[in-house]
Amino acid sequence: MSATMSGSGSAPCRFAHYFIVCGLDDETGLEPDALAALYQWLEADRQGKDPEATAAGENFDQSPLKRTFKSKVLAHYPENIECNPFDQDAVNMLCMPKGLSFRTQRDSLAPHFHSFLITREDGSRTYGFVHTFYEEVTSPQICSAMQTLHQMHQAEHNTSAQNCTSSSSSSSSSSSSSSMDSLSSSLDDVDSPSAHGGRRTCEGYDSIRDTLYVSKAMCLIAPMPFMHACKRFLAQMHRAVSCSPPPPLPLESYIYNVLYEVPLPASGRSLKFHGVYEPILCQRPGVGELPLADFPLADAFRLLGVENLVQLFTCVLLEMQILLYSQDYQRLMVVAEGITTLLFPFQWQHVYVPILPASLLHFLDAPVPYLMGLQSKEGTDRSKLELPQEANLCFVDIDNHCIELPEDFPQFPNRSEFIQELSEVLLSFGQSPEGGSSSPEPAVMSLQTSVLEKELKSTSLRELVDDKTNGNLGGEALDVLELLQGNPTLERLQALAKRTGVKVARLEALAAGQKGDEGVGGRSPVEEEELRNAKLNVQLREVFAARFATMFADYESFVIQNSPDLESWLTNREQMHNFDKASFLSDQPEPYLPFLSHFIETQMFATFIDNKIMSQWEEKEPLLRVFDGRIEKARLYNVRAPSLRSSVYQKCTFLKESAQAIEQRLRKIDHTAIHPHLLDMKIGQGKYQQGFFPKLQADVLASGPTSNKWSNRTCSTQRRVERHRQQNEHLVLDNELKEKYMQEARNLGKNLRQPKLSDLSPAVIAQTNWKFVEGLLKECKMKTKRMLVEKMGREAVELGHGEANITGLEENTLIASLCDLLERIWSHGLQVKQGKSALWSHLLHYQAREEKNEQQLESPVSNGQERRKTESSVGLPGLRVSVIQDMRHIQNMAEIKTDVGRARAWIRLSLEKKLLSQHLKQLLSNQALTKKLYKRYAFLRCEEEKEQFLFHLLSLNAVDYFCFTSVFTTIMIPYRAVIIPIKKLSNAMTTSNPWLCVSGELGDSGILQITKNILEMTFDCQNLGKLTTVQLGHDNSGLLAKWLVDCVMVRNEITGHTYKFPCGRWLGKGVDDGSLERVLIGEFVVPCGDDEGGRGSKTPPLQRSPSQIRRISITSLTGKGNKPTTVQIQESIGEAVNNIIKHFHKPEKERGSLTVLLCGEGGLVWALEQFFHHGFRSARIFQKNVFVWDFFERIVAFMENRDQTGDLQESPEPLSLNSESLCRYVNAINNMPRNIGKDGKFQLLVCLGARDRLLPQWLPLLAESPVITRMYEENALLRDKLTVSSLLGVLETLHDFPITLETSLTKSVEL
């Protein structure tokens, strides 16, 4: 109890919370690892056996020296601390992730260091630092047990060798294996004799001949990651145990000192405390500096190289699944901690396990973003490592210095300049940016040098013991090595050094009466190295931080803060938009967009914005406070000289300043902790045998001092600040609401669970998986809702109900995110891993079964899974709707090389066809296949959640996507075209030779000749994108050349998208306007749902688009008496011009077809045609139809006639130029070889006039010409000067925009 109480008060401000010893418990003896048994239980469950009946039996195939045995926490001090309860299972598992390791004198017995962290459920972290060494086994029972196990292994080995020949033929029958089996076997392959080239076969264990050693670990648990300080303290502790003579004080004194008398350094301060032999320094950054990060980034850059590390950094920012792979636990930790500290001001929000214990391999099955580290074994081949899911995985092979990236990976902005700046920082510290080299280990000393070192150490210790110095050492000046000065053995040691040719700088310096181990400013070489690492660390981090400060310099302007108080914000958190993403993206340089559009969708960015909003009512989150301070400082000093929209790279300006702050702290130590001293121990206590870590005196280590002025003062201050902050929080919100919403708001996304290491029962694992299932369903709901809102928002914009935004980029990001989610769902609980894409693998299994069934049936009738789109009334044959048919389309695309790419293409195609939910429902309807492929806990085997998931996907049928057509722009696509004549009024067929040319946003098909008397044709051509126009014509040959066409229908045979091109006009000489060729403007036919709700399987009736009326001659229009009013005509022109202006205000990739806005229904040509027709005189003169084009021709004839008689020369100069251009354009159109008819010619003139900015110049010529009086009534709009003047102003607004015309409109015109 006293331990708990003593720990609770001062623990938050203590340097270390616990000292722990883990290893072999002699009393319980050798125990198989319980977690390995749990793993067997899980595998038995997966294979459908009774897990309870599975014997835990011994694995005699494996050498006992290589088996996993249970380690135990042998001692930990203090017993418990209230603010950081001791988690025995987690600590034991992470101190010895593989359990106990046994070795003999033939093996390497070198100690090694690693660190770990434990993430608690609230997201807070505790750090552990472990020094593992080997201790001789003295227990006869343990040695005897190991001998017995070895003999059983030998017997098993001999038996299996005899049976090897007979079993080899049958062993190949089973081809499929569990992905987790493969993973564990690939990790264990190296334990087999062959993996080591037979190293172990003849080197067993003989208790008489061999000395047996077992691993033991010393561990410090600390609240902050002071890695270097803890590493040095533990190394000195081990030296004290392994070397002779013992240190001047009992080990308990040093442990007590570090646990209870060494405080945490305050912010912006440095601390010095004493280990067994040398002082240890550490320092903590100030409030305005980057937070503490003591893991050496230099090592991470050295291992991976700058380029790979930047790619890994980008993957982490985009919250992909990251798996680090290395033999060395510390390397895993260094890379994981290094990469997460570089995220400032953002924080990783998902599963974070830098060291994944072997018993937790099933956690790689998690269908969520994660950052995990997996230990490899020497000689393991990466190709054997089969992971449950790889579609969105970034695999980092640290030891081989390489990285495997996911597909569709956007690059970090200004990547090459960024890499260059980082390389310059590394080179300034003498480190190569290339990487690919291991951490530089200290050079191995020769035998003579180590002898000298030992003599040196023993001499210094003897002097220290003789000095009878207990309690605090005699001040700062008392350095252990100084005691050697004037020592009689010094000359002997120097003479020995000279004879052996070994140069020891320290001895020479001591002989000269100096401190030989001190470098610049009185620091030892170790301290110099630590200072260098700290300066390099902070400079590299500053470069990363500066990139974010530049990219998000104005982020605050786009934060949406519309809640009056914290309570209402928390209550409505999920329904609110907190950040104006579209406006933010539109403000960014174009090259940044692919990365930023993905990044602002991540959980870490959402949490960052949440923290910003909550800072209105609460104390600012520390990282946010530092980042905002940086931005404010940059504004104050006007560092950001280039504009925000510029993509000019700006280098970091804080490098020297940040390095100086660290150097100053280490040059002038702010606080020196109390020195280790004798404790209240009896005489004889504290003695121990050399080479063996002793059983410590628990009573003296159980609790700290009752009065420690420094810690009490500091802690009372900290407690007061903490209490004040909590009171403020409680004033804002009552406890109940806070409990309900606060965790959710602050930890959105964090609820996708850290693995809890302390409880790994099957029930807990099942519960964790169930939470994953719930998380996936919630994510699906949020993603589909977001896609619908974005898409509907865009359609509202197109209807004039909003503002144009960057939507296509966002849409593509959201679809890519949906593809990633589906891959994660299909990877969850996977039984058999085949290929990198779990979804595509499932589809291939389904395809194989269905095709086999089809062959067995041998029937041409399509089965229930395949249906045709219902035959439409206009002659388009039904389109086959089938999962397998769409798969075949993807399989025929040579451009896609990988399974992940094929799966994504299939998802995009199904989404575009509005069949995604239906297809996946069909795929999962084969329950036998699903059971074969997936474990019981898999998402796809949870019936209720699966149904909800499919329902959410079904909601996407409410909107139109072109996500397949717009992405795969180079593929060949089959199209089907049908010409539909008006049979009642003309011949269904024509004797002439018809042709058509289909054009789209990406190109055109070229002229396609249609077989006579055939109204339907299919053709293949490169993806045309969304279709815009069809040119339809014939050569006017034969007796029945006149042809009245209602419309042309064109369908993309892969996506099923159908376009209708209304005509309603004659093609033929001497009828209508005499056109032999018409340019038809297309409209997308929205598919109708059938009885299953949004299936989209039949072509709709033609009246689906009522706005498109048939284009008819002016004469028939006037005869019907449906003349538009003058106001309607003026409004239609204004609206047509406004739509064109809106078109150009959209981002270039989002603009769509300008041809529709010019020539389509309600377009500029249509509106001007209404204008020119208003007040047109009697329709029939000499029984001939009169068209607007006739008016233009007469104007031109009149001008040319006046020019010939000389009258035109008296006109003003500008009028002469305008007249000349009008004549030139009209004559060019009349002289072209195409027979496009008079209405077609008028359309072309308007388009050319708009393109070349000539319409406002021509309009006054038409209005002032004498010809107008003969062809227009007095009340005609064209004769109203005010109307003409206002129309000029409207048309002139188009001069600011570069109008380009499709070749289908301008073909053959020579100007």
From Swiss-Prot:
Q: Which Gene Ontology cellular component annotation is one that this UniProt entry carries?
A: membrane
Q: Where is the composition biased (Polar residues)?
A: 154-165
Q: Which InterPro entries match?
A: cDENN_dom (IPR001194), dDENN_dom (IPR005112), DEN5A/B (IPR047278), DENN_C (IPR043153), PLAT/LH2_dom (IPR001024), PLAT/LH2_dom_sf (IPR036392), PLAT_RAB6IP1 (IPR047277), RUN1_DENND5B (IPR047293)
SMART domains under this entry? dDENN, DENN, RUN, uDENN
Q: Where is the composition biased (Low complexity)?
A: 166-187
Q: Where in the cell is it found?
A: Membrane
Region annotation Disordered: residue ranges? 154-201, 854-874
Which keywords describe this protein according to UniProt? Guanine-nucleotide releasing factor, Membrane, Repeat, Transmembrane, Transmembrane helix
Q: What does the record say about its membrane topology? A: Single-pass membrane protein
Q: List, for all copies, the residue spans of the domain called cDENN.
A: 289-452
Q: Where is the uDENN domain?
A: 53-270
- GO MF terms held by the record: guanyl-nucleotide exchange factor activity; small GTPase binding
- Which PROSITE patterns does the protein's record reference? DENN (PS50211), PLAT (PS50095), RUN (PS50826)
Residue ranges constituting the dDENN domain according to the UniProt record: 454-619
Which Pfam family, an example, fits this chain? Answer: RUN
Transmembrane regions: 962-982
Q: What is this protein called?
A: DENN domain-containing protein 5B
